[in-house]
Amino acid sequence: MIYLDNAATTPMSAVAISEMTKVMQETHGNPSSIHSHGRQAGKLLREARQDLALLLGTKPQHIFFTSGGTESNNTAIIGYCLRHQNRGKHIITTAIEHHSVLETIDYLVQHFGFEATIIQPVNQEITAQQIQKALRDDTILVSTMYANNETGSLLPIAEIGHILKDHPVAYHVDAVQAIGKIPIHPEELGIDFLSASAHKFHGPKGVGFLYASTGDFDSYLHGGDQEQKKRAGTENLAAIVGMVAALKEDLNDQVEHYQKLSALKTTFLEEIAGLDYYLNESNHQLPYVVNIGFPGQKNDLLLLRLDLEGISISTGSACTAGIVQTSHVLEAFYGSDSHRLTESVRISLSPLNTEEELKQLAQTLKNIIGD
């Protein structure tokens, strides 16, 4: 069995499992309780927040624990926009965002009268100049991803952040696919809100965090004073500890992992050099996602045949799995009538993958396409 769908989710690291198990076995208190068991849990929660803040180059009060990327995106977008709608109701985002951003913004448009400008990519790129040209006097939020979940394309976050410093506009970045893979320090990049999800960097599912430079946003969940009164509900302490442990491990080996994944991608492409294929990517890319198409090969059938051979890849975002639809990202890149929409598959790597696995994938593709 070969797992090559790491942009959907990653296997948990042994360190994260060990740290979580220890918490589940030894720490039973509610972090909000004032007795000794609660204080013990509260201490672990504070330490996890401090450690995570240190990894991001910020302060603990800027870290809010959530259930994952989707909740973090919703909290930042809805919480900030509803708090500041008296200043304006214009939002800027891009056509290649994750559905948890696009549909959240659409919710504000449909139910609260907001207006959204959706930036379209040009030559598979989103530029800071496009964002700048879209700014209006009533713009209150810009929301972009750091790295695209389907293609691995990188957006010019630092450049956008620099431009927005001169405007009374908050900048939200969905960093779910980038964090742990490249250095990210939100304060240096001019980011006001940053979303992340643990299961994308070998942590547990169902936990994530939101970095917020300010507490000037409305609570998304109500009924308790947890997370500095911004996220009601008892914190998932074991998962939070596991998440921080996983991120520490990924960041410690970040350079080595980047080099390894770049080499694995190169090896794979060399192995399939004899096949007719094309890549769906931009000039600025993360190496761990390979969005590739083979002319004349339907992606759903190719996916099935690889699955029968014990190889797991995908056709795009797992959040729309089971729904028969083409990629909105590739549609934005190439148009709704492009053959790439029905031919392209996503191969996404992690440091746990090996050169032998990529060679086996290449040989299996040659066997299938050569039939």
Residue ranges of predicted features:
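Pyridoxal 5′-phosphate
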Residues: M1-D371
